[in-house]
């Protein structure tokens, strides 16, 4: 008998009342990536957890399916920040999966944008990104270098900005003060507003925001914080 393919593999058991072994410390409804992550973290804290799912298998957007001999993913296409084990994203994945989830690096040219007749490759590594953009947009070297220089300060400012927003008011005050002192002045502006301070070339702006779908808002409406975090996330390429 052949082994099941990823698209036919079933994870979990059918719900039956007589199979329950309660009481449970936590009941999680839905076995998508978020539900499974919460379940794994609670379980690691010694909690007794049950995950309930109406589909025949757990996994949500981690599912895949077959059509005409080809296998397709339903959700996650590729993600970044998996190449080095010290990154926060990699440490989180290793924690919730006990380091069992293995990652494969995609090609250095991991994606491609088409803007009119122009083809722009999304490449791995800051130097490669700069070289690709400068070859496509001669005369825009300073704007491209400034844009890449903006990405790191945003990432460094985010812990303070986040804590200032989620902590109770009394505890948040020092973090708000720190955020005002340390955060770059462009942090609370839209993506388009920031990019138009660097260049008036609309095709370059389109290239820099080509992955706007990952944050769900067009550059006119999206926060530059989110844009910069996503751009930095993929700065060293994609992983699967």
Task: Describe each PLM feature range.
Residues 1-27, 44-45:
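Extreme N-terminal leader/targeting segments of oxidoreductases
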Residues 116-223:
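Rossmann-like flavin
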Residues 86, 182-191, 234-240:
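Short beta-strand to alpha-helix junction loop
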Residues 23, 176-177, 210-211, 232-240:
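Glycine- and acidic
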Residues 43-68:
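Glycine-rich FAD pyrophosphate-binding loop
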Residues 221-235:
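Residues forming anionic-ligand binding surfaces in small-molecule and nucleic-acid pockets
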Residues 24-51:
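N-terminal Rossmann-like FAD-binding beta1-loop-alpha1 element of flavoenzymes
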Residues 64-109:
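N-terminal FAD cofactor-binding segment of flavoenzymes
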């Amino acid at each position: 008998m052949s082994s099941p393919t990823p698209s036919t593999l079933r994870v979990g058991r059918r719900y039956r009342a007589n199979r329950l072994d309660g009481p449970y410390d936590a009941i999680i409804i839905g076995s998508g990536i978020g539900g499974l992550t919460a379940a794994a973290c609670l379980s690691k804290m010694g909690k007794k957890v049950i995950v309930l799912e109406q589909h025949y298998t757990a996994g949500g957007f981690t599912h895949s399916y077959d059509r005409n001999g080809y296998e397709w993913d339903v959700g996650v296409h590729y993600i970044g920040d998996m190449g080095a084990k010290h990154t926060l994203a990699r440490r989180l994945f290793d924690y919730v999966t006990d380091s069992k989830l293995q990652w494969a690096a995609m090609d250095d040219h991991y994606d491609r944008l088409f803007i009119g007749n122009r083809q722009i490759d999304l490449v791995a590594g800051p130097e490669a990104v700069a070289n690709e953009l400068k070859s496509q947009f001669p005369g825009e070297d300073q704007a491209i270098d400034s844009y890449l220089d903006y990405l790191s300060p945003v990432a460094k400012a985010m812990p303070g900005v986040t804590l200032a927003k989620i902590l109770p008011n009394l505890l948040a005050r020092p973090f708000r003060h720190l955020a005002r002192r340390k955060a770059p002045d462009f942090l609370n502006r839209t993506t388009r507003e920031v990019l138009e301070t660097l260049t008036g070339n609309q095709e370059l702006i389109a290239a820099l925001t080509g992955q706007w779908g990952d944050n769900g808002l067009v550059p006119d409406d999206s926060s530059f914080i989110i844009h910069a975090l996503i751009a930095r996330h993929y700065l060293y390429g994609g992983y699967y």
